[in-house]
């Protein structure tokens, strides 16, 4: 085999403990994410609260520890008071971000109840677009204060005796974007976020706050946005956010799978900018990152534009319903590997989104729920990627791409679970033409054996799943990894996602 990669692992060579919240996700009041997604009263799978239990089971399978809510662009014109209290008294509103009609049938308290069903925390975003400090404080009081005040007592009146105790709060969403309702300049947002953070911490000093970073690395204000806004917020927030979506717009699969290298560069630039502000402020505090929107998103763009421009003000129209193919799953796997590589600084991340909207889970309003191709790498990472991210020493063959020069055939990371005495290697062979032999030195893991080698591969890079047929799914291929004398030798088939588990 002419293509080779080599990796040296040692349980003492550590990047960081992985914060399980990097396997978070996102539900926005957009398209069919909420209505006909997680919530569809009258559906055969719905419980007494209208929550689809087939969806609940799939979300539980992904084991998502935190879910961002309610947006997204939606939050910048969100009046949280409309989403609580008796459902029959809640107003219908024009939803400006996606030009839909929001009926507020599902709101803050209902979503919190659903999040408990799927064993997730809520990451709550506040509206810093059309609203500001006082409304953010009122919402926090409603959610987290026990009782005896206007908004905590209002929550109790609404049937929720115990506070929600939401710990993570996003200070707005994508405020650098001119598409955002209430878009701000760097200085405007920095000052507003600083004062909002200071006020919110007076109400609940235990919360964690996320300052808005750049909407993507191609924004003209990147990375000045981070440097300027953090000069205001650095002492008062815990994270700065990152958002990035990728797509195979040129239909060049070889170059498409190099886009995880762009993600790596994006993270490194944000880290450098945060550390510049740290140095400038002579601070001892290190700013961590919340990559709270990431995914593949491009398939549905034309259909979405048609709905917003020509068919507005619908309730839950089918928007952003990308149907993912096999190569999309490979890139999602590569993006997960990239997040794990930066576990020392990326402490939260949200696959955007979770159900129906650029999502791993899809529903049929008249039928069942099903797994998209991207479901599987996320499930594997969430299941086996908990523990300590190891710092691998890697070398190997490369191949040429159109826009990214030469890239490595194999991208990989390993996670050591000390409690279970296991190490899991995640590897993508992004060479579309040839298999690669991966040799991994695991001599520090004495007495280990091959537990399993899971693989996802398909001759058709454009293969998709549907309600009636799963063309892309993982299989066991244990014969592809041999462990002898502390050296694991694995065959990584061309264009494949691999999960290699070693343990005692």
Predicted regions and their residues:
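Active-site His/acidic residue clusters
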Residues: 243-259
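Non-catalytic accessory regions flanking glycosidase/transglycosidase catalytic cores in CAZymes
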Residues: 1-225, 231-239, 263-264, 268-302, ...
